[in-house]
Amino acid sequence: MNLNATLFAQMIVFFVLWWVVARFVWPPLVKALDERSSKIADGLAAAERGKEALALASNEAEQELNKARQEGVQRVAEAEKRAQMSAEEIRANAQAEAARVISQAQQDAAQQVTRAREVLRAEVAVLAVKGAEQILRREVDAKAHGQLLDQLKAEL
């Protein structure tokens, strides 16, 4: 029976082929599949770590953005406060300057009033002398009556 010998030969060839595949082909295939599996697992783990890092970086960026916004608001508030203080200082300086100018003007006016009174006293004295001269139709001696005129001037 050739069938048995053929079957037996096929079984021997099968086992030899199986042994060759198990010995030489199967380990590199398993190794390649294991390496591929580990690379995929590492890639998935790296992707997960990347997602976590992205979420962390996103949170940090949001915190930094909020911090920058708060600092901006604070700086604007400080600038407004400084501007308000500067405006108040300018207003106070202007009021002080206005008070000084008003005081100076009042002093000048008082001095002008005093000068005008002195001028008027002198003119009144001269007019009084001329009036007396005309009334008496004679010349009044200015030296003789100088003290009298100065006293009159002081009274006016």
From Swiss-Prot:
The chain crosses the membrane at residues 7-27. One of its GO terms (molecular function) is proton-transporting ATP synthase activity, rotational mechanism. It is found in: Cell inner membrane. Gene3D superfamilies: 6.10.250.1580. It is a single-pass membrane protein. GO terms for cellular component: plasma membrane; proton-transporting ATP synthase complex. Pfam families: ATP-synt_B. Keywords: ATP synthesis, Cell inner membrane, Cell membrane, CF(0), Hydrogen ion transport, Ion transport, Membrane, Transmembrane, Transmembrane helix, Transport. F-type ATPases have 2 components, F(1) - the catalytic core - and F(0) - the membrane proton channel. F(1) has five subunits: alpha(3), beta(3), gamma(1), delta(1), epsilon(1). F(0) has three main subunits: a(1), b(2) and c(10-14). The alpha and beta chains form an alternating ring which encloses part of the gamma chain. F(1) is attached to F(0) by a central stalk formed by the gamma and epsilon chains, while a peripheral stalk is formed by the delta and b chains. Belongs to the ATPase B chain family. F(1)F(0) ATP synthase produces ATP from ADP in the presence of a proton or sodium gradient. F-type ATPases consist of two structural domains, F(1) containing the extramembraneous catalytic core and F(0) containing the membrane proton channel, linked together by a central stalk and a peripheral stalk. During catalysis, ATP synthesis in the catalytic domain of F(1) is coupled via a rotary mechanism of the central stalk subunits to proton translocation. Component of the F(0) channel, it forms part of the peripheral stalk, linking F(1) to F(0). This is ATP synthase subunit b. The lineage of its organism: Bacteria, Pseudomonadati, Pseudomonadota, Betaproteobacteria, Burkholderiales. The gene is atpF.
